[in-house]
């Protein structure tokens, strides 16, 4: 949908915010949609529907929209073979992410990214360090044997995706990625 690098970054951050739990826990049925005779499931279905919503004029890349998004609006975006699993949690996460973007970054993921060094780790100021601190959705750490273990998979995937797509153009390159 977005050839524009700024919107690619915004979309990637949005997708990574929503990228979890696509199977109904009770029935084990995967969330899926059909487009052009093809069945799309899991994150592929979600990605397609996010882009369709954006193309239809729903500005999911804007923190102000995310902050006020309702479960009814998200249900309309994610119409599939079953109700999107964990829809209530997704709305809560999007509302929190939107509120943080509005409060601290004028509603825009780009301002979050521009607010620090282009490094994943930089004495607490790196992209991953700030993302997991400021956006709890991305903080996938646990306690194991009385020690904190940090995975940061979602945060890493977000920035790997952006870096992989845009590093060749020098538009967005993370200094400590390789």
What are the residue ranges of the model-derived segments?
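HhH-family (HhH-GPD) DNA N-glycosylase catalytic core used in base-excision repair
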Residues: 1-178
């Amino acid at each position: 949908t977005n050839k524009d690098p700024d919107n690619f970054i915004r979309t990637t951050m949005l997708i990574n915010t929503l990228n979890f739990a696509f199977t109904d826990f009770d029935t084990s049925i995967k969330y899926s949609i059909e487009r052009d005779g093809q069945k799309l499931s899991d994150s592929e279905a979600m990605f397609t529907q996010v882009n369709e919503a954006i193309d239809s004029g729903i500005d999911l890349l804007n923190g102000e929209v995310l902050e006020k998004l309702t479960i009814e609006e998200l249900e309309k975006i994610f119409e599939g073979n079953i109700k999107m699993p964990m829809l209530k949690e997704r709305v809560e996460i999007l509302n929190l992410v939107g509120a943080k973007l509005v409060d601290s970054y004028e509603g825009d993921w780009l301002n979050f990214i521009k607010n620090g060094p282009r490094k994943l780790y930089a004495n607490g100021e790196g992209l991953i360090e700030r993302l997991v601190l400021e956006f709890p959705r991305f903080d996938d750490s646990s306690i194991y044997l009385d020690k904190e273990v940090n995975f940061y998979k979602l945060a890493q995937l977000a920035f790997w995706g952006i870096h992989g797509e845009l590093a060749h153009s020098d538009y967005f390159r993370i200094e400590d990625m390789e």
